[in-house]
Regions:
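Short beta->alpha connector loops at strand-helix junctions that form conserved
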Residues: 127, 144, 170, 183-195
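Short, glycine/polar-rich helix-capping loops at beta-to-alpha or helix-loop-helix junctions
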Residues: 168-181
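Surface-exposed amphipathic alpha-helices with a cationic face
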Residues: 156-160
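A short, well-structured juxtamembrane/interface segment
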Residues: 23-41
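Glycine-rich, small/polar surface segments that engage phosphate groups of diverse ligands
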Residues: 37-133
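Conserved small/polar residues in nucleotide/adenosyl-binding loops
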Residues: 203-210
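Generic N-terminal amphipathic, Lys/Arg-enriched alpha-helix
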Residues: 1-23
């Protein structure tokens, strides 16, 4: 997929703000290409992370499921159908609804996750959701600083078995996630070995989400 001018501009701005990521230009662009291609084909994005990474997952979903830098207007065809369906309520829906990029953060759904954790296997809650939500052509985005979280690894294996692509935000060349990824963004430091850099990993990730 050809990168749009807008995407190119955002990538350049990101690298200007965070020069340390310059060595990961191809990985960042590759992740964009994979996710964008899935959306164009009617796919969706599932996101998994623990702790601060779970907060990142929720943040990403919040930006994808509504307008972010631009308001995403509804397709005219849908707007017309809404107006036909309800002349009374349709105008409000047309005014306020926005096009969404389907995304699900799997750290939520407490009834499902606690039931599955209690009845089955706590570390496979993400994998169970991938099994239920995922379809071939969808993308799983996994966020793990160390890449060693078992619940993340279980989810990645399940996604691959379903024919999904797996993109990871992880750290360090020894991250166990790497063999499971079609593309990855590996920070310059080996974050799995240098625990002091975990905060820097989180800082860069949050910075990219908030400012790009």
């Amino acid at each position: 997929m050809k990168q749009t001018d807008g995407a190119k501009k955002q990538l350049e701005l990101l690298l200007q703000r965070y020069p340390i990521l310059a060595g990961q230009r191809d990985e960042i662009d590759g992740a964009y290409q994979i996710i964008a291609a899935s959306y164009e084909a009617g796919g969706k994005l599932l996101i998994a992370g623990n702790g601060g990474s779970a907060a990142d997952a929720e943040h990403i979903v919040g930006e994808l499921m509504k307008g972010f830098k631009k308001t995403r207007r509804l397709d005219e065809a849908l707007a017309e159908r809404l107006l036909r369906e309800s002349p009374e309520l349709g105008p409000d829906l047309v005014q306020h609804l926005q096009k969404a990029l389907p995304a699900i953060a799997m750290d939520g759904h407490p009834a499902l996750t606690t039931a599955y954790a209690n009845d089955c296997a706590p570390l496979m809650c993400f994998a169970q959701q991938v099994n239920g939500y995922g379809r071939a052509g969808d993308v799983l985005l996994v966020i793990s600083t160390s890449g060693k979280s078992k619940n993340i690894l279980y989810a990645a294996v399940t996604a691959r078995a379903l024919g999904m692509k797996v993109v990871g935000l992880t750290g360090g060349a020894d991250s166990p996630l790497l063999p499971l990824l079609v593309d990855q963004e590996v920070y310059p430091e080996n974050l799995a070995q240098l625990g002091r850099n975990e905060a820097r990993s989180e800082e860069r990730r949050v910075g990219k989400e908030c400012r790009s």
